[in-house]
Amino acid sequence: MLLRQLQYIIAVEELKNFTKAASKCCVTQSTLSLQIKGLEDYFGIQFFDRKKYPIELTAQGEALIDKAREVVRLAKEFEEAAKNMKVNNS
């Protein structure tokens, strides 16, 4: 599982649209869709109900979206802490 895939899921959830989320993430819509589908296949769940418009999270997606946000937040905190250590050690 890649951090980027979680960022894609979060973007789709926020924008309720795969095309807009892809634009925000600077990737093609097909790349974003394939990455999310890959994560769904890996875990055997569906994050989004693609039949609804605007796109909505499934119950499984609802149960996991806050955890995805937490992972992304912690990764950003880790990156900042590591950068600060580098600056302080120079």
Stretches with model-predicted labels:
Residues L2-Q5, Q29, G61, A68:
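The N-cap/first-turn positions of alpha helices
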Residues I10-T28:
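Short helix-boundary/capping micro-motifs
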Residues N17-F18, I36, R50:
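Helix-turn-helix DNA-binding elements, focusing on the entry/boundary residues of the two helices
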Residues S23-K24, D41, E62:
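Alpha-helical residues within the helix-turn-helix
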Residues E40-L57, E79:
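A short LG(V/I)-centered, amphipathic sequence patch enriched
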Residues K76-K83:
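A short, exposed helix-loop element centered on a Lys and neighboring polar residues
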Residues K83-S90:
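Interdomain hinge and pocket-entrance segments immediately C-terminal to HTH DNA-binding domains
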